[in-house]
Amino acid sequence: MMSKKNYEALGLIETFGIVFVLEAADAMCKAADVELIGFENVASGYISVLVTGDVGACRTAVDAGVKAVNDMGAEVYSSVVIARPHEDLEKITRRYTFDKLLPTTED
């Protein structure tokens, strides 16, 4: 779950294919002080990646992610930075978290 400290903004990029999403996520995390929340396979290969942090960091991260995808010759379907998101958005973004996406192992 997102910490209240980092809930100042959300940054999202949606593109086609896991390779491009990984490149975007890597560029986003390297470009700014953001927390990678997770990803979601939206439909038919379109995948969104989500970060959170302060507004400036999310803008920098999204710009870097979009550039990284474009530099690989792919297209970004959509991107957005949501400043001061309403706390109820966590009901949606909660599904992006890695603990919801990855299988758990029992000891």
Predicted regions and their residues:
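Long, contiguous binding/interaction regions
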Residues: 1-46, 52-107
